[in-house]
Swiss-Prot record:
Residues 1-25, 320-355 are annotated as: Disordered. Forms homodimers, and probably higher-order oligomers too. This is Inclusion membrane protein A. Belongs to the IncA family. Chlamydia replicate within a host intracellular vacuole, termed an inclusion, which is formed by fusion of many smaller inclusion bodies. IncA is probably involved in the homotypic fusion of inclusions.
Amino acid sequence: MTVSTDNTSPVISRASSPTFGDHGKDFDNNKIIPISIEAPTSSAAAVGAKTAIEPEGRSPLLQRICYLVKIIAAIALFVVGIAALVCLYLGSVISTPSLILMLAIMLVSFVIVITAIRDGTPSQVVRHMKQQIQQFGEENTRLHTAVENLKAVNVELSEQINQLKQLHTRLSDFGDRLEANTGDFTALIADFQLSLEEFKSVGTKVETMLSPFEKLAQSLKETFSQEAVQAMMSSVTELRTNLNALKELITENKTVIEQLKADAQLREEQVRFLEKRKQELEEACSTLSHSIATLQESTTLLKDSTTNLHAVESRLIGVMVQDGAESSTVEEASQDDSAQPQDENQSDAGEHKDS
């Protein structure tokens, strides 16, 4: 998210530096002096602050299919469990293929149910929220840095405005003294050059603006004729025009400073909003962690119940095997009892024939 852009405020500097060697011809330079101001834009920051945290979701059709499969698996697990309990209660014998099929259905259903429970936990949402919290922390740090930079720019612009005001005052005084002076210009020009040297420390842009005035001072040293004085007075008139441009520049800088202050307040509001959002997300993460712990306990209980169900199945299989062995023993005993009367009848019939 972009927090600052470079805005360039062009100021047209019209400074006339008369060259007295050309017999009163005015040397007019129209120069555009850009002043680079780092002004923040609040639209991108507001859009970033209003960005909602939404967990990654699946397509509606896939969600419905997964939900249907989970329901079918739960129903199958329940039906197989009920069937096993009914068979145990009635003591009916289950064939080996049917038993294997029931066990396979139970295992598959159990795996699907466990997967559904795992997918049902909001772990993905928790991870996404943690990433959002980290991003908000980085954004918060970056916004703090941007605010500090804006404050530094604000201080620098204020200092430049104060120095430009002083330059405006000195140039006005110089113009008044120049209009009133009709004698020696040596002291006046030396004072003027000294003032220009003091204002070179403001920056390269202001130094560029002062270059016409330096040419003017050099020209005043070369000649002091009446015609040169008149040309210089016309130059002072244009200097006043340039001073008006400086006044407009000062007004524009004041407007920029007010905008910077408003943007700094907006950054502070965004920082407070992000901190509040961070606290809410931390509370949500703690709640989700508690839910995950509860679901893990439920999973443990479900595993215990499945273990008990396997134990019941093992007992059922043992009981069925024991019942089958007892039934086979009873059938063999009944066959032996029926065979003994037949042998006795055959022996009686043989004795009757002999008699």
